[in-house]
Amino acid sequence: MALYGKKTDLSSASSGGYTGVADVYQLWHYHARGNGNIGDKPSYTLEQARDQITRGNITWNGEKVFGKSAALTYSFLQSVADSDMPDNFKGFVKFNAAQIQQTKLALQSWADVANVTFSEAKDGERATIQFGNYTLTPDGNTDNNSQAFGFYPGNWKWAGSAWFNYNQADNQRPDINEFGRNTLTHEIGHTLGLYHPGDYDASDGNPGYKDVTYAEDTRQFSIMSYWNEGYTGGDFHGYHAAAPHDIAAIQKLYGANMSTRTGDTVYGFHSNSGRDFYTATDSKTPLIFSVWDAGGNDTFDFSGYSANQRISLISGTFSDVGGLKAMVSIAAGAVIENAIGGSGHDVIVGNLSDNRIDGGAGNDVLYGDGGADILTGGAGKDIFVYAWEKDSLSSAPDTITDFQRGEDRIDLSAFNKNHDLRFVDNFSGKGNEVVLNWDSQSHQTNMWLHLSGHETADFLVNIVGAALQPSDVIV
């Protein structure tokens, strides 16, 4: 999977010392994957990981029937005799109120991303997906070791059922930010046809990360994984809804839900998403999610955090938010248009949409990418980065709303790898020229770049409220 598709190699642009370009370049390539090995394991593209997690080719519509929606029912079992329990487990306990509530939220999170609907079965109706607890091992002893198990779609009695060890406290109270919610979502994934990313199982003895098929088999990339995200550089203690590879996998099986959050949705602080895992209520709330969003003009609002953050609006990439690493991502195919940073020193990278990016307080680095972006640095010494001419075309220019001379800088060093970019009063037609034109009526500087030597400038940025000078520009 090509995540970036840039035409400019920025690695050498930052070689002469610190520039904002260096930070942008690092974030572009943060957790890039699918190119060679990481350690002794191959790195998988999104498509390879998706196919690995769906390698059983099982759906509720039949074997190898992909992309077709499914209307499923669920129920909470009320009683099961020991002789009738699956895999010879014993000691049935029905779901408590907390489990029922959290299960409905977990089901909802799967329905958000794929064309599966869930409705509670009527009394006496055999549900597609059934939930129950167990407490005893097959030999009748108290089970203090296992966590849970679930069965794939099928046509036998316990196909599509999920079972949880009631002796585990986090299964009894599977709240958000607790492992029990992760377990619920994981087991529901099995009932929908998702496999572990590798050929391992808790019943296989003592499997470990050494047994993975590919390097990204951790909970950073898939809630179906057994392995801690620390193996791949994350540090956020697991998802509570589908992760990037899971979203791609479940959408392969049932199709993408294109009616999910088609309005203007805010994720993070001031969230209107209606989902607990997308919502931060205070600076101590960890945000751990991979967002699927089908439309609208949407915003990442991470304004309540004081830690330095790295926020990427590029589909398929990860962000460091709220002091944790790689715990927010955007699922492939989803578009988030806007970002608001916090009071730390943030790096924010936009995408090809018309982005609104607000760095907040702190010394921030902002990069809008393509589109007619509106960039606000906020308080602090900010750097506005441009990497190639399509970042701010003269036909669709960016606007920097609050440039402060002597504090902020504009970084054009990516254009100047040959050290031939020069400031002039008027274009000569030779190319690689910059004109700074102060417009007293609009109270803004128009920064024009003429790279090709043609009659029309290739690049324009409008800088509000500042009579820009060459010393304000990093070349």
From Swiss-Prot:
It catalyses: Preferential cleavage of bonds with hydrophobic residues in P1'. Ca(2+) 2 binds at residues 296, 298, 337. PROSITE patterns: HEMOLYSIN_CALCIUM, ZINC_PROTEASE. It is found in: Secreted. Hemolysin-type calcium-binding repeats lie at residues 340-357, 358-375. Its cofactor is Ca(2+); Zn(2+). Ca(2+) 4 binds at residues 351, 355, 368, 370, 373. Zn(2+) binds at residues 186, 190, 226. Belongs to the peptidase M10B family. This is Serralysin G. The lineage of its organism: Bacteria, Pseudomonadati, Pseudomonadota, Gammaproteobacteria, Enterobacterales. The gene is prtG.
